[in-house]
Structure formats: C-alpha cells, structure tokens
Amino acid sequence: MRRFWAKGGYGEHGRSCFLMEYGREGRYCMVDCGIMDSDSQPYPDVTSEELSKTDYLFLTHCHKDHSGAFMEFVKRGFCGVLAASQMTIDLSNISYEKQIVLPVDEKKTPWKTKIYEITLTYGRTGHCPGGLSFYIEDEKGAVFFSGDYQEDTLA
C-alpha cells in the first residue's frame, strides 16, 4: 500500500473505515464503511472525490458500525466493487450490482485470491456470521484488518 488513512473508527466505537492508496497512484481501496448513529456526524470522514476513486470496498462484517454507510457512500460517488461474504451482504441488506462474493469453504482456511493488482487473503473472524478478516497486499506493501475478532467463535 502506498498510503493509509483511518477515516473513522480509530479510538471510537463506530464509523469503522480505512482508506488505502494502492497500485496505481491516486486509486484507492477501502475496508469497512460504518456509521455512528449516536453522533451528529454519523459517517466516516471520506470525501466524494475519494469515493469516486475507490476501486474496491471490502466489508469485514454486517454490523452497522462496519457496513452501515454503504448506501450513503454510493450516493456520494462510490461506484467501485464491493467484496464481502454472501452472509455479510445479505445481513447488511445491501443491494448493489458490482460485487465480488468471497467464497467461504468450510474445508479450507484461510482463502487467497487475486483481484487485479491486489492479493487478498481472508479468513473467518468468529465475531458474527459471515465475518472475515483481510490481509491485503500489493507491490508496495501489505496491511491486515481483523474487523471485530472473537476468540470463542459465535459463528
């Protein structure tokens, strides 16, 4: 990753959102897009320009503090690809055409796939049904996101 920004969720419960410049300069991928509905500014601090330059949005899980801003981000200019487990997409009530459903095979973990310039390794977190952690790599570096993690699995 060329650069990394915490756009929300850092030092607070809610608004989880992390933006990374990757591969091609000026292009982004994002992990999570949560809301904090107890705040007068519930959405992460992401500009419309950043959203329009975001190629991929990876969701760790369905809880609104990690996925609740998705449709607002689409309204503000996100038109990239959503990547998440089918369970996360379903439980988040997201209807969006451009998506990559990350398969979760019970027999094999972690899972690894290549999405253009990004190598994505992901695995279950146990926090909730469909919850995933992500290890995202490009030619400049890598970053790991656990989402919310639970040692004693709930899902």
PLM regions with names:
Residues 1-58, 63-155:
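His/Asp/Glu-rich metal-coordinating catalytic cores
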